[in-house]
Design a protein with these regions (language model features):
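Solvent-exposed loop and edge beta-strand segments that line ligand/cofactor-binding
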Residues: 80-92, 104, 135-152, 191-207, ...
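CBM-like, beta-strand-rich accessory domains located in the C-terminal region of large
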Residues: 133-135, 339-341, 390-401, 405, ...
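Active-site lining segments of carbohydrate-active enzymes
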Residues: 138-256, 267, 354-366
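Long, well-ordered core segments of solenoidal/helical folds
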Residues: 56-68, 115-133, 176-196, 229-249, ...
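Non-membrane alpha-helical segments in proteins
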Residues: 90-105, 117-121, 152-164
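Extreme N-terminal leader/anchor segments
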Residues: 1-49, 98-104
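Carbohydrate-active enzyme catalytic cores, enriched for enzymes
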Residues: 262-390, 397-442
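Structural helix-adjacent loops and short alpha-helical linkers that scaffold large soluble proteins
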Residues: 103-116, 161-182, 217-235, 272-288, ...
Length: 629
């Protein structure tokens, strides 16, 4: 463990969080944020973000505040649907965020009035926790004191708004905000504490909740001793959060939850350092540096990621967070530069949008290069190679070959996943892989599905995003991969080029036998070999699946293996081949037509945001009788 709590006990913190230091930090931060926010209005790189802010402000003048009614709150319990309530909830937060930022830039009276209205609307909500996170069986803690991710975010948001605009807001509004943050968050977490599960969680909840509650305590608690006790407690929670990462810095929840959890960890660390007069720095360990590099390591090209677990392949990274991490690491990032608009984030997160404005440094960004990254504790491999001309890459499995064409200078990439099937936001995806061609995942991971009650309930493996049937892995004797830590990928062989360039010789071999409950299966290994072709004219991925089955006396028991390949691109078939054509690259799979016949299924589905799309499942089946299929 990092043991932040041991390094910074309350007895040590109390002298660093006295009133004088706090007042100085408050004045300096308010001045710096205000100055920087106003400067960004005229800077072209922020134009899209400010257009979103003005669009939301205009809408707020023309329409009333959306209502979070109690019947809407009850809808999750009755139907399992989360989205109807959450859409209104996040619209409220986004509207308030836009109004506050616009008011800081130009404090027109109507804007300040709308800010006050928004603050009062949020203070009157039944609970700040989402219905999906309210524990109805908890008879001790009422819903309005159940502190989840979004209650914590709300407390942080309101505290930071008071920091920025408190002197200009109506005193009754300020008092009401302080009272509600105290009653709904600070009291149940610190002063009359209940134990929340996130306090000892080893995933994003620990960091987000500790950050939100910790920043609210820093900004709103006046007693130095009480503040020190609160911060010590949150540092203990952050110790658990860091324990969820291996020494390789890999995030098993995927890059989206890395942004969420580690991003809020950084936001809290920065605020704690500022409000301790630069005395408390919790970002000094080597492990923090490894975690900070995670997004770069799983980035394939053009803002597209290896998106295992519940993450999107097109994750928009907060430019403020990435800029801050670049400063922490003392180098430019290989990630593409983009300042996200307010409306690009469905959750309209205040913490991200504020820091995108006050922290972003366009000079901190660069461009991706050919490289191999392997995260041994996480079990993920990423290989990136840049082609020099129109070329092809090949993949083979069971004698089949795939060919990918790509344009000159295109980034060709491959990623494979090991790990186990009991990870946070787990998908049953051991041995799954991604093939990437210049900004597109041609063979892909579907990422997160639409969050409902069923998505996090027993039997969730039937959902295609979670099932191994929605990944590029085989179905063995009609069985999918099983859930649980006993299903794990054991690394049998790994070779990565010493120069970390994606050259001949990069390979990974996994034993995946335990992933499948098929009784007849005694051995299943999958081997990947990524090769850059001579002259850097493309790359070849070779996949070899090796199966052994039980025999009955002198004969082997019947068996069958159905290989699956998942893509958002509709494949084209011909005599002995399947091809997936992207915008700049194409994957071609060649196979023995005497032995195999592909079956292609178009599957209608909805993504994490409820938007309909179609993906394509290609299957090729082998069986013990060796008859054509």
């Amino acid at each position: 463990m990092s043991l932040l709590k041991e390094a910074w006990p309350a007895s040590r913190l109390v002298t660093m969080l006295d009133g004088g230091v706090q007042d100085t930090a408050r004045q300096r931060l308010r001045s710096e944020w205000t100055k920087r926010l106003r400067a960004t209005v005229a800077e072209p790189v922020y134009a899209e973000l400010w257009m979103d802010i003005e669009r939301v402000c205009k809408n707020s003048r023309e329409t009333p505040w959306p209502e979070l009614s109690f019947p809407l709150f009850q809808q999750f319990a009755h139907t399992g649907e989360r989205k109807p309530y959450e859409d209104v909830y996040f619209e409220q937060r986004g509207r308030l965020a836009a109004l506050v930022l616009a008011a800081v830039a130009d404090s027109e009276p109507w804007r300040m009035k709308e800010v006050e209205n928004g603050l009062l609307e949020i203070c009157q909500e039944y609970t700040w926790a989402l219905p999906a996170h309210v524990r109805e069986e908890d008879t001790v803690t009422p819903p309005w004191q159940q502190v989840d991710l979004f209650a914590s975010e709300t407390a942080q948001m309101l505290a930071e708004i008071l920091l920025l605009l408190g002197e200009e807001l109506n005193g009754h509004v300020v008092a009401g905000v302080r009272e509600e943050v105290e009653r709904r968050v600070l009291e149940p977490v610190f002063w009359q504490p209940r134990h929340f599960e996130w306090e000892t969680a080893e995933h994003n909840w620990a960091a987000v909740c500790a950050s939100g509650c910790g920043i609210a305590a820093l900004l709103l608690t006046e007693d130095s001793q009480g503040k020190a006790v609160a911060i010590e407690k949150m540092l203990g929670t952050l110790d658990y959060f860091l324990e969820g990462y291996g020494e390789d810095g890999g995030c098993p929840e995927g890059v989206g939850y890395w942004v969420y959890g580690f991003g809020y960890f950084i936001y809290f660390a920065d605020m704690l350092r500022a409000f301790s007069g630069e005395a408390v720095n919790i970002l000094t360990s080597e492990k923090i540096g490894e975690i900070a590099a995670f997004a770069e390591r799983v980035h394939l090209s053009d803002g597209i990621f290896a998106n295992y677990s519940d993450s999107s392949e097109t994750e928009r990274l907060p430019s403020g967070l990435v800029s801050n991490l670049n400063d922490l690491q003392g180098r430019r990032s290989a990630l593409p530069f983009h300042v996200s608009g307010l409306l690009e984030d469905p959750c309209r997160r205040w913490a991200h949008v504020l820091r995108n404005l006050v922290w972003t440094n366009p000079l901190a960004f660069g461009s991706g290069e050919a490289a191999v990254d392997y995260l041994p504790q996480l079990g993920w491999m990423m290989c990136r190679s840049r082609s020099s001309s129109r070329s092809s890459s090949h993949s083979s499995s069971h004698g089949r070959a795939a060919r990918t064409k790509a344009g000159s200078g295109a980034m060709l990439a491959f990623s494979a996943k090991g790990g186990h099937n009991n990870e946070p936001h787990n998908h049953n995806d051991l041995g799954h892989f991604i093939l990437h061609g210049d900004g597109e995942n041609l063979l892909c991971d579907l990422g997160a599905g639409l969050y409902t009650k069923a998505y996090f309930s027993p039997g969730r493996e039937s959902i295609v995003n979670i099932s191994s049937g929605g990944h590029s892995v085989p179905v063995v004797n009609g069985t999918m991969q099983q859930s649980g830590a006993r299903a794990k990928a054991v690394v049998l062989d790994i070779a990565v080029d010493e120069q970390k360039e994606a050259r001949t010789g990069t390979r990974l071999k996994l034993d995946l036998t335990s992933a499948y409950p098929a009784e007849e299966l005694t051995v299943f290994t999958r081997s990947f070999a990524w090769t850059v072709l001579e002259g850097n004219e493309g790359a070849r991925l070779t996949i070899t699946d090796h199966f052994e089955f039980e025999s009955s006396g002198v004969s082997m028991k019947p068996w069958d293996v159905e290989e699956l390949l998942i893509s958002r691109f509709q494949p084209r078939t011909g005599a002995g081949f399947v091809e997936w054509q992207g915008t700049k690259a194409a994957v071609r799979l060649d196979y023995d037509a005497n032995m195999l016949r592909p079956r292609i299924e178009a599957v209608k589905h909805v993504d994490h945001d409820g938007v309909s799309f179609v993906f394509y499942k290609t299957s090729l089946k082998w069986c013990s009788d060796r008859k054509p299929h």
